[in-house]
Amino acid sequence: MKNSQLFFLRWLGWVFLLGTILTGSGFAGVASSDSIENRLRAILSEQAESIDLTSALLLISQDWNPSLNEVPLRTELARITESVRKRLSPSSSAKETVEALREVIHREGGYQYTDQVDARGIPLNPDELFLHGMLKSKRGYCMNLSLLYLIVGDRLNLPLHGVGLPNHFFVRYETENARINIEATESGVTFPDSFYENRFGVKFDPGTSFFTQNLNKRQTLGAYLSNVGMVHYRNSRLEKAIF
């Protein structure tokens, strides 16, 4: 890839990421049109804790594939959520909760990391970058596999957070008494912070503004949209590449 093209792709990703994170609720003034873009902007204008991850991600999928039928996708998400719910009780520990998620998503559901990715870890099959593609093929990459955890956590009010790293994303379960990193690309195995520090060359510093920190739902979607923008660009959808 020529240096100029690589620079543009990186710039495009950061436009998505920084625009979403730094503007916060700055999507005010949404037009009355019911377009997918405006519906997504309306969702992102909500308080971060009120954002419905499922609705946002399905809208992003519909923007890629307007003929998408979301009913079977919502049905699958409901099945996964209910299966996790049945394994939990009010007394479930952090480890038991993480094990329930791992069991349902990977062992029962069969969701795994796709082996068809580019040097950045982005799926070569563009559908597998989106929620709908992962739910159909049961193959995804670090971002949407993590998003599956976060959707279930959102529905069950579990203390799950997305965590961004350079060219990677994982899930963290965190309360006052427990902190567990969940690696969705390796069937939900848990790793200490030191594993990620060594592999990705970053320090888990509480003072860091983005990388290694627990992200809210708006920030998580911002990180995801950076990848979506690159996929639109690579597939010559330039009008969609800048949201």
Segment roles from a protein language model:
Residues 11-24:
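Bacterial N-terminal signal peptides
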Residues 26-243:
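A structural boundary/capping signal
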